[in-house]
């Protein structure tokens, strides 16, 4: 991926000349890592939201959804990749997407349900008294009031996914994990530092941005 590693000062943690020579490769790895993370989280939200809305109203379904998502979360990512490779292929994006989306569900579903459970009974009663249909009540009352818990789940899922995407380098998926893997294989610390550092920076930045989005979507909380 990154060509030959030239000799460098072994006492230095980062070979800045090498970094400058491979900026395009590093940028591509970071961009692919970010895109894959966004795909995983978006798919996770699209699955978790309807599941949570249905499970919040049905105790039996809630137990099933939470139980299944928890079981999926216990499967190691490498084992999940190995199980899927015969069906999706070694280089298929779905080999990574399916397990990582499954992992987000345990975080997203629990937070979404907690947020819906926290909606005051009085708010639901007021919506019913105003003649809202069930759909209107969910869209205009319950989901807005559940936003803090929903966004907390999205933040946690995003940060954890950024870390998990690095593991996909084991099966050759392009990401910042490839830098770390190549650095370990070549005993070249610059690759390790750049890959791990950018993944950490991406996680911190994503968390701050999502936290700001959460505050922007809940102006009534700032007024307290």
Regions found by a protein language model. Give the residues of each.
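Periplasmic/extracellular loop-to-transmembrane helix junction in inner-membrane transport proteins
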Residues: 4-41
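Loop-to-helix entry region at the N-terminal start of transmembrane alpha-helices
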Residues: 25-36, 85-107, 146-147, 191, ...
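Cytoplasmic-entry segments and transmembrane alpha-helices of multi-pass inner-membrane transporters
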Residues: 28, 51-84, 100, 110-114
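Membrane-embedded alpha-helices of multi-pass transport/permease systems
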Residues: 46-51, 95-124, 147, 154-162, ...
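C-terminal transmembrane helix and the adjacent membrane-cytosol boundary/short C-terminal tail
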Residues: 59, 114-117, 121, 193-224
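Glycine-rich helix-loop "coupling/hinge" segments at transmembrane-helix boundaries
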Residues: 86-87, 164-199, 218, 224
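Short cytoplasmic-facing helical segments at TM-TM junctions of multi-pass membrane proteins
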Residues: 111-150, 176, 180
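Transmembrane alpha-helices
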Residues: 134-167, 194
